[in-house]
Protein backbone atom coordinates (compact mmCIF):
# COMPACT_ATOMS: atom_id res chain seq x y z
CA UNK A 1 0.00 0.00 0.00
CA UNK A 2 1.33 3.44 -0.98
CA UNK A 3 1.87 5.69 2.03
CA UNK A 4 0.92 9.34 1.76
CA UNK A 5 1.67 12.25 4.08
CA UNK A 6 0.76 15.91 4.39
CA UNK A 7 2.96 18.75 5.63
CA UNK A 8 0.64 21.56 6.69
CA UNK A 9 -2.29 19.26 7.38
CA UNK A 10 -4.49 21.55 9.47
CA UNK A 11 -5.09 24.45 7.11
CA UNK A 12 -8.18 24.34 4.93
CA UNK A 13 -6.39 22.77 1.96
CA UNK A 14 -4.53 20.25 4.12
CA UNK A 15 -7.62 19.13 5.98
CA UNK A 16 -9.59 18.83 2.74
CA UNK A 17 -6.83 16.60 1.40
CA UNK A 18 -7.17 14.43 4.49
CA UNK A 19 -10.94 14.18 4.12
CA UNK A 20 -10.62 12.99 0.52
CA UNK A 21 -7.61 10.72 1.07
CA UNK A 22 -9.38 8.82 3.84
CA UNK A 23 -11.79 7.59 1.14
CA UNK A 24 -9.02 6.58 -1.31
CA UNK A 25 -8.80 2.79 -1.61
CA UNK A 26 -5.21 2.60 -2.90
CA UNK A 27 -3.31 4.60 -0.28
CA UNK A 28 -2.71 4.80 3.44
CA UNK A 29 -2.01 8.02 5.32
CA UNK A 30 1.35 7.42 7.01
CA UNK A 31 1.91 10.67 8.91
CA UNK A 32 0.89 14.33 8.94
CA UNK A 33 2.44 17.48 10.37
CA UNK A 34 1.26 20.88 11.54
CA UNK A 35 3.38 23.60 13.13
CA UNK A 36 0.32 25.13 14.79
CA UNK A 37 -0.93 21.86 16.30
CA UNK A 38 2.23 19.79 16.76
CA UNK A 39 1.60 16.73 18.93
CA UNK A 40 -2.18 17.07 18.88
CA UNK A 41 -4.68 14.50 17.64
CA UNK A 42 -6.37 15.50 14.40
CA UNK A 43 -9.86 14.72 15.70
CA UNK A 44 -9.32 17.11 18.61
CA UNK A 45 -8.73 19.93 16.11
CA UNK A 46 -11.42 18.99 13.58
CA UNK A 47 -14.29 17.11 15.22
CA UNK A 48 -15.59 15.86 11.85
CA UNK A 49 -12.78 13.27 11.96
CA UNK A 50 -13.96 11.70 15.24
CA UNK A 51 -14.09 7.93 14.86
CA UNK A 52 -12.50 8.06 11.40
CA UNK A 53 -8.79 8.41 12.15
CA UNK A 54 -6.32 8.37 15.03
CA UNK A 55 -3.72 10.53 13.26
CA UNK A 56 -1.53 12.77 15.41
CA UNK A 57 0.30 15.82 14.06
CA UNK A 58 4.01 15.01 14.11
CA UNK A 59 7.14 16.69 12.77
CA UNK A 60 7.98 17.29 9.14
CA UNK A 61 10.96 14.93 9.04
CA UNK A 62 8.81 12.02 10.18
CA UNK A 63 6.31 12.77 7.41
CA UNK A 64 9.10 12.66 4.81
CA UNK A 65 10.61 9.50 6.28
CA UNK A 66 7.38 7.49 6.56
CA UNK A 67 5.68 8.27 3.23
CA UNK A 68 6.09 7.66 -0.49
CA UNK A 69 4.09 10.72 -1.56
CA UNK A 70 4.11 13.99 0.36
CA UNK A 71 1.71 16.87 -0.16
CA UNK A 72 3.01 20.25 1.01
CA UNK A 73 0.16 22.62 1.91
CA UNK A 74 2.06 25.69 3.05
CA UNK A 75 2.08 29.48 2.57
CA UNK A 76 4.25 30.93 -0.25
CA UNK A 77 7.99 30.67 0.29
CA UNK A 78 7.94 27.72 2.67
CA UNK A 79 7.85 24.75 0.29
CA UNK A 80 11.11 25.05 -1.65
CA UNK A 81 13.48 23.81 1.06
CA UNK A 82 11.07 21.08 2.12
CA UNK A 83 10.51 19.92 -1.47
CA UNK A 84 14.28 19.66 -1.88
CA UNK A 85 14.46 17.24 1.07
CA UNK A 86 11.56 15.22 -0.31
CA UNK A 87 13.14 14.89 -3.76
CA UNK A 88 16.57 14.09 -2.26
CA UNK A 89 14.89 11.21 -0.42
CA UNK A 90 13.48 9.91 -3.73
CA UNK A 91 9.91 10.66 -2.72
CA UNK A 92 7.13 12.32 -4.72
CA UNK A 93 6.25 15.91 -3.80
CA UNK A 94 2.98 17.58 -4.75
CA UNK A 95 3.17 21.21 -3.68
CA UNK A 96 -0.14 22.93 -3.03
CA UNK A 97 1.45 26.35 -2.64
CA UNK A 98 2.81 28.87 -5.12
CA UNK A 99 6.54 28.14 -4.87
CA UNK A 100 6.89 26.20 -8.14
CA UNK A 101 4.08 27.64 -10.27
CA UNK A 102 6.15 30.34 -11.98
CA UNK A 103 9.15 29.45 -14.15
CA UNK A 104 10.52 33.00 -14.45
CA UNK A 105 12.57 33.99 -11.39
CA UNK A 106 12.26 37.73 -11.99
CA UNK A 107 8.50 37.42 -12.23
CA UNK A 108 8.45 35.35 -9.06
CA UNK A 109 10.55 37.94 -7.21
CA UNK A 110 8.25 40.75 -8.38
CA UNK A 111 5.10 39.04 -7.08
CA UNK A 112 6.45 37.15 -4.06
CA UNK A 113 9.39 39.31 -2.97
CA UNK A 114 12.13 36.65 -3.07
CA UNK A 115 14.39 34.76 -5.44
CA UNK A 116 14.21 31.04 -6.09
CA UNK A 117 16.03 29.18 -3.32
CA UNK A 118 16.62 26.13 -5.53
CA UNK A 119 16.58 27.16 -9.22
CA UNK A 120 17.46 23.66 -10.48
CA UNK A 121 14.44 22.23 -8.72
CA UNK A 122 12.17 24.68 -10.53
CA UNK A 123 13.38 23.32 -13.85
CA UNK A 124 12.19 19.81 -13.02
CA UNK A 125 8.80 20.76 -11.58
CA UNK A 126 5.69 20.21 -13.71
CA UNK A 127 2.58 22.38 -13.63
CA UNK A 128 -0.13 20.04 -12.40
CA UNK A 129 -3.12 20.81 -14.60
CA UNK A 130 -3.98 17.28 -15.79
CA UNK A 131 -6.19 18.43 -18.65
CA UNK A 132 -3.13 20.18 -20.09
CA UNK A 133 -0.05 18.26 -18.90
CA UNK A 134 -1.16 14.70 -18.18
CA UNK A 135 1.79 12.94 -19.86
CA UNK A 136 4.35 15.24 -18.24
CA UNK A 137 2.71 14.75 -14.85
CA UNK A 138 2.88 10.97 -15.26
CA UNK A 139 6.70 11.11 -15.44
CA UNK A 140 7.28 13.71 -12.73
CA UNK A 141 8.15 13.52 -9.04
CA UNK A 142 7.60 17.24 -8.36
CA UNK A 143 4.22 18.79 -9.12
CA UNK A 144 3.22 22.44 -8.80
CA UNK A 145 -0.49 22.14 -8.08
CA UNK A 146 -2.28 25.06 -9.79
CA UNK A 147 -4.01 27.84 -7.92
CA UNK A 148 -7.79 27.83 -7.60
CA UNK A 149 -8.54 30.90 -9.73
CA UNK A 150 -6.01 29.83 -12.41
CA UNK A 151 -7.64 26.39 -12.63
CA UNK A 152 -11.07 27.85 -13.37
CA UNK A 153 -9.73 30.42 -15.85
CA UNK A 154 -7.25 28.18 -17.67
CA UNK A 155 -9.77 25.38 -18.17
CA UNK A 156 -12.14 28.00 -19.55
CA UNK A 157 -9.67 29.29 -22.13
CA UNK A 158 -7.44 26.36 -23.20
CA UNK A 159 -9.50 25.20 -26.23
CA UNK A 160 -9.75 28.70 -27.74
CA UNK A 161 -6.06 29.49 -27.24
CA UNK A 162 -4.87 26.09 -28.49
CA UNK A 163 -6.79 26.71 -31.69
CA UNK A 164 -5.53 30.33 -31.93
CA UNK A 165 -9.11 31.58 -32.19
CA UNK A 166 -8.98 34.61 -29.88
CA UNK A 167 -6.89 37.73 -29.54
CA UNK A 168 -4.18 37.22 -26.88
CA UNK A 169 -4.70 40.60 -25.22
CA UNK A 170 -7.74 42.27 -23.75
CA UNK A 171 -8.97 39.09 -22.02
CA UNK A 172 -11.03 39.94 -18.94
CA UNK A 173 -11.34 37.41 -16.11
CA UNK A 174 -13.94 38.32 -13.51
CA UNK A 175 -13.84 35.69 -10.75
CA UNK A 176 -15.77 35.12 -7.54
CA UNK A 177 -14.72 32.78 -4.74
CA UNK A 178 -15.96 31.47 -1.44
CA UNK A 179 -14.06 32.61 1.63
CA UNK A 180 -12.15 29.33 2.16
CA UNK A 181 -9.87 30.56 -0.62
CA UNK A 182 -8.45 33.06 1.86
CA UNK A 183 -7.31 30.29 4.20
CA UNK A 184 -7.97 29.56 7.87
CA UNK A 185 -5.98 32.44 9.39
CA UNK A 186 -8.04 35.26 10.85
CA UNK A 187 -8.65 38.25 8.58
CA UNK A 188 -10.88 41.30 8.77
CA UNK A 189 -12.07 40.73 5.19
CA UNK A 190 -13.37 37.26 6.02
CA UNK A 191 -14.73 38.19 9.46
CA UNK A 192 -18.42 37.20 9.44
CA UNK A 193 -19.95 40.70 9.85
CA UNK A 194 -17.67 42.02 7.09
CA UNK A 195 -18.41 39.28 4.55
CA UNK A 196 -21.99 38.29 5.34
CA UNK A 197 -24.54 39.99 3.07
CA UNK A 198 -21.63 41.50 1.18
CA UNK A 199 -19.82 41.00 -2.12
CA UNK A 200 -16.33 42.46 -2.36
CA UNK A 201 -13.60 42.75 -4.99
CA UNK A 202 -10.06 42.56 -3.61
CA UNK A 203 -6.42 42.81 -4.71
CA UNK A 204 -7.59 44.62 -7.83
CA UNK A 205 -4.85 44.52 -10.46
CA UNK A 206 -2.37 42.92 -8.07
CA UNK A 207 -3.51 39.38 -7.28
CA UNK A 208 -0.62 36.90 -7.29
CA UNK A 209 -2.51 34.43 -9.48
CA UNK A 210 -2.24 36.88 -12.40
CA UNK A 211 1.31 35.91 -13.52
CA UNK A 212 0.50 32.21 -13.15
CA UNK A 213 -2.52 32.52 -15.43
CA UNK A 214 -0.64 34.64 -17.98
CA UNK A 215 2.35 32.28 -18.09
CA UNK A 216 0.25 29.16 -18.68
CA UNK A 217 -2.01 30.83 -21.25
CA UNK A 218 1.03 32.28 -23.06
CA UNK A 219 2.59 28.82 -23.25
CA UNK A 220 -0.62 27.42 -24.71
CA UNK A 221 -0.98 30.17 -27.31
CA UNK A 222 2.77 30.33 -28.04
CA UNK A 223 2.56 34.11 -27.75
CA UNK A 224 2.31 36.63 -24.91
CA UNK A 225 -1.17 36.60 -23.39
CA UNK A 226 -2.28 39.39 -21.06
CA UNK A 227 -5.37 39.46 -18.88
CA UNK A 228 -7.27 41.78 -16.60
CA UNK A 229 -8.05 39.70 -13.55
CA UNK A 230 -10.30 40.85 -10.71
CA UNK A 231 -11.18 38.43 -7.89
CA UNK A 232 -14.16 38.89 -5.57
CA UNK A 233 -15.20 37.32 -2.27
CA UNK A 234 -18.65 35.76 -2.12
CA UNK A 235 -20.38 35.24 1.25
CA UNK A 236 -20.22 31.44 0.82
CA UNK A 237 -17.77 28.84 2.10
CA UNK A 238 -16.58 27.27 -1.14
CA UNK A 239 -16.77 27.50 -4.90
CA UNK A 240 -15.39 29.66 -7.71
CA UNK A 241 -17.17 31.01 -10.74
CA UNK A 242 -15.19 32.86 -13.41
CA UNK A 243 -16.76 34.93 -16.17
CA UNK A 244 -14.22 35.29 -18.97
CA UNK A 245 -14.55 37.77 -21.84
CA UNK A 246 -12.44 37.47 -24.99
CA UNK A 247 -12.50 38.62 -28.61
CA UNK A 248 -12.34 36.21 -31.56
CA UNK A 249 -9.80 36.88 -34.30
CA UNK A 250 -12.47 36.16 -36.89
CA UNK A 251 -16.23 35.85 -36.70
CA UNK A 252 -17.26 32.45 -35.33
CA UNK A 253 -20.63 30.98 -34.39
CA UNK A 254 -21.49 29.48 -31.03
CA UNK A 255 -22.07 25.96 -32.38
CA UNK A 256 -18.53 25.88 -33.76
CA UNK A 257 -17.11 27.09 -30.44
CA UNK A 258 -19.11 24.47 -28.57
CA UNK A 259 -17.78 21.69 -30.82
CA UNK A 260 -14.19 22.84 -30.25
CA UNK A 261 -14.73 22.59 -26.49
CA UNK A 262 -16.55 19.25 -26.52
CA UNK A 263 -13.90 17.75 -28.81
CA UNK A 264 -11.08 18.95 -26.57
CA UNK A 265 -12.64 17.81 -23.29
CA UNK A 266 -14.36 14.61 -24.50
CA UNK A 267 -11.81 12.33 -22.81
CA UNK A 268 -11.26 14.53 -19.74
CA UNK A 269 -13.83 13.26 -17.27
CA UNK A 270 -13.71 16.08 -14.75
CA UNK A 271 -14.55 18.84 -17.25
CA UNK A 272 -18.14 19.07 -18.45
CA UNK A 273 -19.02 21.39 -21.32
CA UNK A 274 -22.68 22.23 -20.79
CA UNK A 275 -25.26 22.18 -23.60
CA UNK A 276 -25.77 25.53 -25.30
CA UNK A 277 -28.28 27.60 -23.38
CA UNK A 278 -27.25 26.21 -19.98
CA UNK A 279 -25.27 28.36 -17.55
CA UNK A 280 -22.52 27.00 -15.28
CA UNK A 281 -23.05 27.51 -11.55
CA UNK A 282 -21.22 26.81 -8.30
CA UNK A 283 -24.07 24.72 -6.90
CA UNK A 284 -23.60 21.97 -9.48
CA UNK A 285 -19.85 21.52 -8.85
CA UNK A 286 -19.73 22.07 -5.08
CA UNK A 287 -18.04 19.20 -3.20
CA UNK A 288 -16.89 17.61 -6.47
CA UNK A 289 -13.73 17.56 -8.58
CA UNK A 290 -15.69 18.74 -11.61
CA UNK A 291 -15.41 21.88 -13.70
CA UNK A 292 -18.52 23.05 -15.54
CA UNK A 293 -18.08 25.30 -18.55
CA UNK A 294 -20.83 27.16 -20.39
CA UNK A 295 -20.32 29.11 -23.61
CA UNK A 296 -22.02 32.30 -24.72
CA UNK A 297 -21.75 35.03 -27.35
CA UNK A 298 -22.34 38.75 -27.02
CA UNK A 299 -23.41 39.34 -30.63
CA UNK A 300 -23.60 43.10 -30.16
CA UNK A 301 -19.89 43.31 -29.28
CA UNK A 302 -18.66 40.22 -31.16
CA UNK A 303 -17.42 38.83 -27.86
CA UNK A 304 -17.07 35.27 -26.56
CA UNK A 305 -18.10 34.79 -22.92
CA UNK A 306 -17.06 31.68 -21.00
CA UNK A 307 -18.44 30.76 -17.60
CA UNK A 308 -16.26 28.31 -15.64
CA UNK A 309 -17.29 26.92 -12.25
CA UNK A 310 -15.31 24.74 -9.82
CA UNK A 311 -15.13 23.93 -6.12
CA UNK A 312 -12.09 25.95 -5.05
CA UNK A 313 -11.16 23.43 -2.34
CA UNK A 314 -11.42 20.32 -4.55
CA UNK A 315 -10.76 20.88 -8.26
CA UNK A 316 -9.07 24.13 -7.26
CA UNK A 317 -6.83 22.46 -4.67
CA UNK A 318 -7.08 19.08 -2.88
CA UNK A 319 -8.98 17.12 -5.53
CA UNK A 320 -6.68 18.23 -8.31
CA UNK A 321 -3.66 17.26 -6.19
CA UNK A 322 -5.09 13.77 -5.72
CA UNK A 323 -5.84 13.62 -9.45
CA UNK A 324 -2.15 14.37 -10.06
CA UNK A 325 -1.10 11.70 -7.56
CA UNK A 326 -3.35 9.15 -9.26
CA UNK A 327 -1.75 9.89 -12.63
CA UNK A 328 1.81 9.56 -11.28
CA UNK A 329 1.06 6.29 -9.47
CA UNK A 330 -0.86 4.74 -12.35
CA UNK A 331 -4.20 4.61 -10.52
CA UNK A 332 -7.51 5.39 -12.17
CA UNK A 333 -7.67 9.15 -12.49
CA UNK A 334 -10.95 9.29 -10.58
CA UNK A 335 -9.81 7.08 -7.68
CA UNK A 336 -11.05 8.75 -4.50
CA UNK A 337 -12.66 11.50 -6.58
CA UNK A 338 -15.90 9.95 -7.78
CA UNK A 339 -17.83 12.75 -6.11
CA UNK A 340 -21.28 14.05 -7.04
CA UNK A 341 -22.45 17.47 -5.92
CA UNK A 342 -25.47 17.44 -3.61
CA UNK A 343 -28.70 18.57 -5.26
CA UNK A 344 -29.31 21.16 -2.55
From Swiss-Prot:
Any one biological process term the GO annotation gives: L-arginine biosynthetic process
Organism: Clostridium botulinum (strain Alaska E43 / Type E3)
Pathway: Amino-acid biosynthesis; L-arginine biosynthesis; N(2)-acetyl-L-ornithine from L-glutamate: step 3/4
Catalytic residues (positions): 148
Enzyme Commission code(s) on record: 1.2.1.38
Predominant localisation class: cytoplasm
Catalytic activity, reaction form: N-acetyl-L-glutamate 5-semialdehyde + phosphate + NADP(+) = N-acetyl-L-glutamyl 5-phosphate + NADPH + H(+)
Enzyme class: oxidoreductase
Gene3D superfamilies reported in the protein's UniProt record: Dihydrodipicolinate Reductase, domain 2, NAD(P)-binding Rossmann-like Domain
InterPro entries: AGPR_AS (IPR023013), AGPR_type-1 (IPR000706), NAD(P)-bd_dom_sf (IPR036291), NAGSA_dehydrogenase (IPR050085), Semialdehyde_DH_NAD-bd (IPR000534)
Domain of life: Bacteria
GO terms under cellular component: cytoplasm
Protein name per UniProt: N-acetyl-gamma-glutamyl-phosphate reductase
Keyword NADP set for record: yes
Summary of the function given for this chain in its UniProt record: Catalyzes the NADPH-dependent reduction of N-acetyl-5-glutamyl phosphate to yield N-acetyl-L-glutamate 5-semialdehyde.
UniProt family annotation: Belongs to the NAGSA dehydrogenase family. Type 1 subfamily.
Name of the gene encoding the protein in the UniProt record: argC
Keyword annotations: Amino-acid biosynthesis, Arginine biosynthesis, Cytoplasm, NADP, Oxidoreductase
Subcellular localization(s) per the UniProt record: Cytoplasm
Gene Ontology molecular functions: N-acetyl-gamma-glutamyl-phosphate reductase activity; NAD binding; NADP+ binding
Amino acid sequence: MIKVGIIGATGYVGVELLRLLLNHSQIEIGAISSVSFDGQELDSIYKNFLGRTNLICTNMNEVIEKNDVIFTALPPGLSEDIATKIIENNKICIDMGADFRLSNEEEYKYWYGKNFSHPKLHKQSIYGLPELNKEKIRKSSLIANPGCYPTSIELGLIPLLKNLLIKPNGIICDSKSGTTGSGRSLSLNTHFPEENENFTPYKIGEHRHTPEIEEILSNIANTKVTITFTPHLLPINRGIISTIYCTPKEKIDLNSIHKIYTDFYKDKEFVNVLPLGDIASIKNVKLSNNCHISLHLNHRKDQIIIISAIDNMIKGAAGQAIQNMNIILGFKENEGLNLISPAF
